[in-house]
Amino acid sequence: MVGQITKTFKFSTAVTSRDLISLNKFISTEFKQVRYKMYIMDGSIYDTDDINQILEYDNPPLRKITKIEINANKVAKDFYLLPDFEISLSDLSKSSYSIKYEIRNVTNKELDYYVKKIDEFSLNFKSSYSILNSPQFFSITVVIFLIIIAIFIAFLSKKISLNHYVSTVAALSAAIGFVLAKLVPSFLYWLYPQSIFCIGKQEQYYENKKKLRNNIFVGFFLALMVGILGSVAVNYFMK
């Protein structure tokens, strides 16, 4: 009995040279004919049968990798026909999925084995900050900010009427909620891209972004501590 399957994943990914080499080693062992395609941000496409040409790709800032495809066959045949195996590693910001693979023309036992192994490789590509790119995280962040705003206003406005308090909270929540809903996702996507290809010179690019991320968070917490200590000092001396 011959079967086939198609699976997709939508989590954030970090495609590193190490994980790509590991995946390629498995595919090259199981299949006899392997070919690669690399899609670039400017629209160009590269076709090769040598994985090293992808690993050594010198990608300038405006020509970053957006997708890598690996196609393979059990026996040599024309790749214009549907291959026995294909996997796409895509930039989630430009695609409806980050990983998609299809397996065809294999037995039931082979299908179970391949699905288990490719699922494992796919999870290896999942970024450590994948949760930060989920819609649920954005929603929770906005709600938390709105709760903090409501508490802050309640603390400052103990003497105003309930109606005035409710209308003030509602107006500020709507305005700030709208701003957060727009700015938070954009800021997080900038700091934590939905998909990255740490291959070639892009490795250094994302290392620099990681350092920038750390500096931003250190600066944020230092500013927060200074603000708290300043508030305590003002309250102490104003007594």
Describe these PLM feature segments:
Residues 1-41, 195-205, 209, 213, ...:
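N-terminal pre-first-transmembrane soluble regions of secretory-pathway and organelle membrane proteins
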